[in-house]
Swiss-Prot record:
Annotated consequence of substituting residue 660 to H: In strain: AKR/J
The UniProt record lists the keyword Kinase: no
ZU5: annotated segments: 799-932
Protein name, as recorded: NACHT, LRR and PYD domains-containing protein 1a
Keyword annotations: ATP-binding, Cytoplasm, Hydrolase, Immunity, Inflammasome, Inflammatory response, Innate immunity, Leucine-rich repeat, Necrosis, Nucleotide-binding, Nucleus, Protease, Repeat, Ubl conjugation
Activity regulation remarks: Nlrp1a inflammasome is activated by pathogens and other damage-associated signals: activation promotes ubiquitination and degradation of the N-terminal part, releasing the cleaved C-terminal part of the protein (NACHT, LRR and PYD domains-containing protein 1a, C-terminus), which polymerizes and forms the Nlrp1a inflammasome. Nlrp1a inflammasome is inhibited by DPP8 and DPP9, which sequester the C-terminal fragment of Nlrp1a (NACHT, LRR and PYD domains-containing protein 1a, C-terminus) in a ternary complex, thereby preventing Nlrp1a oligomerization and activation.
Upper taxonomic lineage: Eukaryota, Metazoa, Chordata, Craniata, Vertebrata
Keyword field contains Cytoplasm: yes
Site (Trigger for autolytic processing): 906
Family: Belongs to the NLRP family.
Species, as recorded: Mus musculus
Protein task: Acts as the sensor component of the Nlrp1a inflammasome, which mediates inflammasome activation in response to various pathogen-associated signals, leading to subsequent pyroptosis. Inflammasomes are supramolecular complexes that assemble in the cytosol in response to pathogens and other damage-associated signals and play critical roles in innate immunity and inflammation. Acts as a recognition receptor (PRR): recognizes specific pathogens and other damage-associated signals, and mediates the formation of the inflammasome polymeric complex.
Location of the NACHT domain: 133-442
Major location category of this protein: cytoplasm
Other remarks in the entry: Three tandem Nrlp1 paralogs, Nrlp1a, Nrlp1b and Nrlp1c, are present in at least 2 strains, C57BL/6J and 129S1/SvImJ. Nlrp1c is predicted to be a pseudogene. Nlrp1b is the primary mediator of macrophage susceptibility to Bacillus anthracis lethal toxin (LT). Neither Nlrp1a, nor Nrlp1c are expressed in anthrax lethal toxin susceptible strains, hence neither of them is thought to play an important role in this phenotype.
Length: 1182
């Protein structure tokens, strides 16, 4: 018990020092080790700087360092604790300098980007399937990049990460490397190791097993150019550090080595001109769970962790700011100081700037120290301008900091001394940038020289950060925050000074004026405005946002872009909070849409903004989002469709809607995961005299109970709603009647679904006369249908609609052409094909099953897209069909496949067109007001995944009974009606009969292999099946199971090959075998009564003819011309040769096919005999 308590206290102390180095609660667990190590490091550093590094001394240093390295057992939890940083793997192209989240438009479409874990940093690149040699970790200041980099090194050392990928991992702080003028490769490697692990020659002998971690690559003022790629110096020869690093990154030295870089900026091309295409990973900070976990570690759960985190949770803005690990440390430090001073715990800060000022007020003890603080601010500003983060003792003295002041700043944690050198640095780079911004505020220039001073400050900032990235710089954001009226008062109180407020405020306008006036507004500017929070400034700047319109993500999908709508990509809760805060002051934004994916949403009727986000939104952020919106008095339309909303989030939304100041008129909540539980909240809004006039609740499972609660709100006289979009197909007749009654009593109220399937639309006959009875029109259409031979299909192929089943008729079985005559307006669904039509009037629809191979092989899309559904050629009267539901077999419930990857391919005379569906549902992609041509669903492939995606599949079992012997054919295929039909037709030719058994319940994966087994000892060939997609015109994979005499039941099973988990099983009984043979498919009238042997056994011949060339030699001159002979022989495999031969046989006469049969009997007699024996010795027209 005591030992456990001691461990907890030790962990708490470590966490409290964490922010001073790298936002890591268990960082530097062995301070004593560092002190000893530093003694050797200091001497090593002196040798490097003096350029005296004899080989014997190097060996001695290595031997001396090695025994000192011991790791605390507490570091074992580090890997577990910090894998929860949100990592977002991006796909930006090289040369694209705008970070997605920093611009009004993404540099590339982001559908392929995704969240990853730390183990996946060096995973295969999307598109190449190769592991990257260069990974760039990017992110905002204080977000945890350095923590992640150090974690990779430590986890590798402990054998938990990349141990098989890299034999040696070297960690470098670029701020420290920049202190050296010259280094050799050997010296660099010594710098990157805690202790030497092998001789330098051995290390360099396998460059592909080396990982160099360069932390803060963009911090020093250097250009890492590979100046002379052809000159390869010996590893012991020295060269300028920037040249050495440039040669490594440019692959002139150790071309097989891998690199992990951390940086704030994505515009690395100016620092590293030879940089190759990297894998870019953005760190998005802490999840909500990790924020709580951080507080528990810092204070100890029982010693204040719960109390402090509860306090922070009560301030939603502060909780959101804490997604940045550095801010978490800052908040914890402030609360700890309050505890030590015995004051009441209180933290009301809404911005990072206010939090930093609170930190200063709590940590700087007296007026003397505050005077010294001015000098520290000057040091910080000088370092920012010169891109320096390490300072010598003489640098501090030059700024007027004496030993006592230095010691005091070290004690309170503002400064820290580097363990590996004699240098000093600020506790965090963000803290240095805050002090730098403070130095500009504390400048004592006379008022008459203020404009000149402001110009000089802005020029310095522009020179340091560049115009394009000016608003991304923390120094500039802190400046905006410090120049708010409220914060200026705090500064005056803190430093007991008087600041010229109006003069200082001019600095903001100088910054805004000097930045590119025609540059599209960026997310960084909104962050600056949020830090300032001045209403006048915000109103003025946000008023100008409407001046620049730029393409949005929808434009990338070739859709029509609304020119009055702005598009902004956000990634974090903090981004969302900042944007919605600023929107309150933008009078032009009257519509707002928040999408979790880049997809087409509702079209706005007023100027608006679309926000795109790929990570989930927390309840705390929803609360801030909605509380900001209640103050946005110009906002009229809000579209949250597709965002999963918790009960807490909907409660926050409804609280906002009930406020009198909320002017929202239109609210779209389509597919938000709402249930009947939420309806009481929504009903309270309807009866609260809210301004809401239109509400869309489609694609939510509200149920009868939920809709009844909505009806209570609709009956309230205070309800202003005029349009309610509501799915009614699943509602009971009683509830639908209640809705109709409400409409009848309130003529201004319309309750409907988007498709209005129950509405009867008057139709016109050929003479333009209105036909009221749609049955009469149906009769007329039947009379006009022509003289084609038609026959009804079975009941499973019927369409089910408002009046019950509608029969589907066969127009041309050989072409797979069918016709259905829908008798009235409504919704019709065919269970067999999965097709679903919504029509406005009676209409005749023709449906032809097509093979993808006929169309897709002619396009380049087969490399980038994959088929995920059947291909139909649909013909219908224009305008009669308002929606078509095309089936797909992707298992969306697995959460792996993004619905924005779905496209509908239209094959037209002038080429192929890809259309984005209106929405993608569990089994369908929906097209609204469709135009018809051969069409089906394609899925854009993510190269790293390829075809390996979860799908709904089906098993097809067929049997053939010969005397008393039974043979089964077992197929495992995607749940595609066209494939099922093609297999049915093929098996029917061989007189096999299908047995219906349930399909696999769980999703299976395309590209995976599965093992077929039986409860009895039977012959199964092959025993392994691959789940793959093959076009209906191609032969499908199946296992043949020879049972022999079946006198008892038998169980068939399918297991995945990798884990041998059971995926499907079926029990076959003797009673399943029907004695009657299936009828032979009707052949065309002018065709022979039966198929030729060659056509009847095409599939087996393709699969089983093992020697094609002798067969071709016998056909040469008789059936095959010289050109045809060479075309077939040019194919690489026997199966491809046979397929090519069969493609040529389409034009052959019956005599030519007889020639083929004779040649086959001579070259493959045993194969022919085996086929004939299975048919009972009957040869068909041979």
């Amino acid at each position: 018990m005591e030992e456990s308590q001691s461990k907890q206290e030790s962990s708490t102390k470590v966490a409290q020092h964490e922010g001073q180095e790298d936002v890591d609660p268990t960082f530097k667990t062995k301070k004593l080790m560092e002190v000893e190590l530093m003694k050797h490091r200091v001497q090593l550093e002196r040798n490097l700087k003096l350029r005296t590094f004899p080989g014997a001394r190097t060996k001695q240093v290595k031997e001396a360092l090695y025994p000192l390295l011991t790791w605390s057992s507490k570091s074992k939890n580090l890997f577990q604790n910090f894998t929860k940083l949100l990592l977002f793997k991006k796909l930006c192209q090289r040369g694209s300098e705008n970070l997605v989240r920093e611009s009004w438009y993404p540099c590339v479409p982001e559908e392929e980007a995704h969240m990853i874990d730390i183990q996946d940093l060096f995973g295969p690149n999307l598109g190449t399937q190769k592991k990257p040699q260069l990974v760039i970790i990017e992110g905002a200041a204080g977000i945890g990049k350095s923590t992640l980099a150090r974690l990779v090194k430590r986890a590798w050392k402990e054998g938990k990460l990349y141990r098989n990928d890299f034999h040696h991992v070297f960690f470098f702080s670029c701020r420290e490397l920049a202190q050296y003028e010259q280094l050799s490769l050997a010296e660099l490697i010594v710098q990157g190791q805690e202790v030497p692990t092998a001789p330098i020659r051995q290390i360099l002998s396998h460059p592909e097993k080396l990982l160099f971690i360069l932390d803060g690559i963009d911090e020093p003022a250097w250009v890492l150019a590979d100046q002379n790629p052809e000159l390869c110096l010996h590893w012991s020869q020295t060269q300028p550090v920037h040249t050495l690093l440039g040669s490594l990154l440019g692959k002139s030295i150790l071309p097989g080595a891998s690199f992990l870089l951390t940086t704030r900026t994505t515009a690395l091309q100016k620092f590293i001109p030879s940089l190759e295409q990297p894998c870019q990973v953005e760190v998005l900070g802490f999840t909500l769970f990790e924020r709580k976990n951080y507080f528990y570690k810092y204070f100890g759960k029982k010693k204040g962790g719960v109390t402090t985190f509860t306090l922070v949770k009560s301030n939603s803005a502060l909780l959101t700011l804490c997604e940045v690990p550095w801010v978490c440390w800052l908040v914890c430090t402030c609360l700890k100081k309050q505890m030590e001073q015995g004051g009441e715990l209180s933290l009301t800060s809404q911005t990072t700037t206010a939090l930093c000022l609170k930190y200063l007020s709590l940590t700087i003890p007296g007026q003397h120290m505050r005077t010294q603080l001015r000098d520290l601010c000057s040091l910080a500003a000088e370092g920012v301008c010169q891109r320096r983060t390490l300072f010598s003792e003489s640098d501090l003295c030059k700024q007027g900091l004496d030993e006592h002041a230095i010691a005091s700043f070290l004690k309170i944690g503002v400064l820290q001394k580097q363990a590996s050198s004699l240098s000093y640095s600020f506790a965090h780079l963000c803290l240095q940038e805050f002090f730098a911004a403070m130095s500009y505020i504390l400048d004592d220039s006379e008022e008459r020289h203020a404009d000149m001073k402001n110009d000089r400050i802005v020029e310095t900032l522009v020179e340091r950060y560049g115009r394009q990235n000016l608003f991304e710089a923390p120094t500039v954001r802190f400046l905006f925050g410090l120049l708010s009226k409220e914060e200026l008062k705090k500064i005056e109180k803190l430093f007991s000074c008087s600041l010229h407020g109006k003069t200082k405020l001019k600095l903001l306008w100088h910054i805004l004026g000097k930045s590119q006036p025609h540059q599209p507004p960026c997310l960084g500017l909104l962050h600056c405005l949020y830090e300032n929070q001045d209403m006048e400034l915000l109103t003025h700047v946000m008023h100008d946002l409407q001046g620049t319109i730029v393409p949005g993500p929808d434009d990338l999908a070739h859709t029509v872009l609304q020119t009055n709508v702005k598009h902004l990509v956000i990634q974090t809760d903090m981004d969302l909070m900042v944007v919605t805060f600023c929107i309150k002051f933008c009078c032009h934004v009257r519509s707002l849409q928040l999408n979790r994916k880049v997809q087409q949403g509702h079209k706005f009727t007023a100027p608006g903004m679309v926000l795109y986000r790929w990570t989930p939104i927390t309840d705390a952020s929803w609360k801030i989002f909605f509380s900001n919106l209640k103050l946005a008095r110009n906002l009229e339309e809000l579209d949250l469709s597709g965002n999963p909303l918790s009960y807490y989030a909907v409660h926050s939304l409804c609280t906002t809607l009930r406020k009198r100041g909320c002017q929202l008129k239109t609210l779209w909540l389509v597919e938000c995961g709402l249930t009947s539980t939420y309806c009481s909240l929504l009903a309270s809004v309807l009866s609260a005299r809210s301004s809401l006039t239109e509400l869309d609740l489609q694609l939510n499972d509200l149920g009868d109970g939920g809709v009844k609660m909505l009806c209570e709100g609709l009956r309230n006289p205070a309800c202003n709603l005029s349009i309610l979009w509501l799915d009614q197909a699943s509602l009971s007749d009683q509830v639908i009647a209640e809705l109709r009654t409400l409409e009848a009593k309130n003529p201004k109220l319309l309750i409907s679904s988007t498709w209005k399937p129950h509405v009867m639309v008057p139709t016109m006959n050929m003479d333009k006369e209105e036909v009221g009875d749609s049955q009469a029109l149906l009769k007329q259409q039947r009379q006009q249908s022509g003289d084609k031979h038609m026959e009804p299909l079975g009941t499973e192929d019927e369409f089910w609609g408002p009046t019950g089943p509608v029969t589907t008729e066969v127009v041309d079985r050989e072409r797979n052409l069918y016709r259905v005559q829908l008798p009235m307006a409504g919704s019709y669904h065919c269970p067999s094909t999965g097709l679903h039509f919504v029509v406005t009037r009676a209409v005749t629809i023709e449906i032809e099953f097509c093979a993808w191979s006929q169309y897709l092989d002619k396009t380049p899309l087969q490399q980038s897209h994959m088929v995920v559904g059947p291909l139909f050629d649909i013909k219908a009267e224009q305008g009669a069909v308002t929606a078509v539901y095309l089936p797909h077999f992707v298992a969306l419930q697995e959460g792996i496949v993004d619905s924005s990857l779905f496209h509908v391919a239209h094959f037209q005379e002038h080429g192929m067109v890809l259309e984005t569906p209106a929405r993608v549902e569990q089994h369908y992609a929906v097209l609204e007001n469709p135009s018809f041509s051969p069409m089906g669903i394609l899925l854009r492939m993510i190269p790293a995944v390829g075809h390996f995606i979860p799908i709904t599949s089906t098993t097809l079992i067929y049997y053939h009974l010969y005397l008393e012997d039974v043979t089964f054919h077992l197929y495992l295929v995607p749940n595609d009606c066209s494939i099922r039909k093609a297999i049915d037709d093929e098996e029917m030719k061989f007189q096999f009969v299908r047995i219906n058994k349930p399909p696999p319940v769980d999703a299976l994966y395309l590209g995976s292999r599965y093992i077929v087994s039986s409860s009895k000892l039977v012959e199964i060939i092959p025993k392994e099946l691959e789940l793959c997609y093959r076009s209906p015109g191609e032969s499908q994979l199946f296992s043949e199971i020879d049972i022999g005499h079946m006198d008892s039941e038998i169980k068939l099973q399918i297991k995945d090959k990798r884990h041998m988990n059971l995926k499907w099983e079926a029990l076959l009984k003797p009673g399943d075998l029907r004695p009657a043979l299936p009828k032979i498919a009707t052949a065309p009238k002018d065709a022979p009564s039966l198929l030729h042997f060659m056509d009847q056994h095409r599939e087996q011949l393709v699969a089983r003819v093992t020697s094609v060339d002798p067969l071709l030699d016998k056909l040469h001159g008789l059936v095959l011309s010289e050109d045809s002979y060479e075309v077939v022989r040019s194919e690489t495999t026997n199966q491809d040769k046979m397929r090519k031969l069969f493609s040529l046989s389409r034009s052959w006469s019956w005599d030519c096919k007889d020639q083929f049969y004779q040649a086959l009997k001579e070259t493959h007699p045993h194969l022919v005999m085996d086929i004939l024996e299975k048919l009972g010795g009957v040869s068909v027209k041979s």
